[in-house]
A protein has these predicted regions:
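Bacterial Sec-dependent N-terminal signal peptides
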Residues: 1-23, 227-230
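Hydrophobic alpha-helical transmembrane segments of integral membrane proteins
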Residues: 8-9, 117-120, 185
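Short glycine/proline- and aromatic-enriched beta-strand/turn motifs that initiate or cap beta-hairpins
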Residues: 17-67, 230
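Gram-negative (and chloroplast) outer-membrane scaffold detector with strong preference
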Residues: 27-31, 39-45, 74-151, 226, ...
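Residues that define the transmembrane beta-barrel architecture of outer-membrane proteins
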Residues: 29-31, 65-69, 114-118, 134, ...
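Flexible, solvent-exposed loop segments that connect beta-strands
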Residues: 47-62, 94-115, 148-166, 201-216
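Predominantly the C-terminal beta-signal and adjacent terminal strand-loop region
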Residues: 167-169, 177-230
Length: 230
């Protein structure tokens, strides 16, 4: 009788000691799909033709970091244990502002740079061993962005208020996140750095343009925070 009574009291403790494992075979599926949405913050790295020490303000171009959004689909192809190939096509939207404080006219000092990227990344995802219902991971890869707002075909340039950029940009990416396994789906918050490989600048027609004359190139850099459901 004492043993039965002791067993009754121990059962709840044993149940707590053995957590329920959600989606136990999820990581062994050959292919998984889902969707994501999130926010981004982007700015430009600005490279100059030459540092003009006789007139320092000419190199003092300021990039105002701004916030936008990301949305897209995910496909995950299992390669081996802990390693998968991910395809995450989507849309990235952002509106940045370049400021040229050395220009005197107020209408000349600021230029908006719209970015509406059709975003096509291919990434490798390496995950740690799963701990109960969560698993940390890292990602690395490359992507291409097709900017629908590049103004590259416009004949107008900064002299008429249009800052032009290249329509196709290649990036490299590094990131990390945590997979959480719920009873019905895998939920993943992640952070990813995005860095352009290509110069996105299209120079103005005038080689001595105060907006682009001393610029060697501009390169997107930013951070994306996504919530993924698979």
């Amino acid at each position: 009788m004492k043993r039965i009574t002791l067993l009754i009291f121990l059962l709840p403790l044993l149940a707590k000691a053995q957590p329920i494992i959600n989606l136990e075979d999820f990581d062994y599926q050959k292919f998984q799909w889902g969707y994501y949405f999130g926010i981004n913050t982007l700015d430009f790295r600005v490279d100059y033709q030459a540092l003009d020490y006789t007139n320092p303000p000419l190199t003092d171009i300021q990039t105002k970091r701004s916030y936008g959004f990301n949305v897209g689909l995910t496909g995950d192809l299992r390669l081996i244990d802990h390693l998968s190939l991910r395809f995450e096509p989507g849309l990235i939207y952002n509106k940045r502002e370049l400021e040229f404080p050395f220009l005197t006219q107020q209408t000349d000092r600021k230029r908006e740079v719209l970015s509406t990227y059709i975003y096509i990344p291919v990434l490798l995802k390496y995950g740690s061993k799963r701990w109960d219902n969560f698993k940390p991971y890292i990602t690395a890869g490359t992507s291409v962005g097709i900017n629908l707002s590049a103004n590259n075909k416009s004949r107008s340039d900064n002299s008429e208020g249009k800052f032009r950029t290249q329509p196709i940009v290649y990036f490299y990416e590094l990131g990390f996140g945590i997979d959480f396994y719920t009873p019905h789906f895998r939920f993943t918050p992640s952070i990813r750095g995005l860095f352009s490989i290509d110069n996105e600048l299209i120079h103005d027609s005038d080689p001595a343009s105060p907006w682009t004359g001393n610029l060697k190139g501009i390169f997107t850099r930013g951070v994306m925070i996504n919530l993924t459901f698979e």
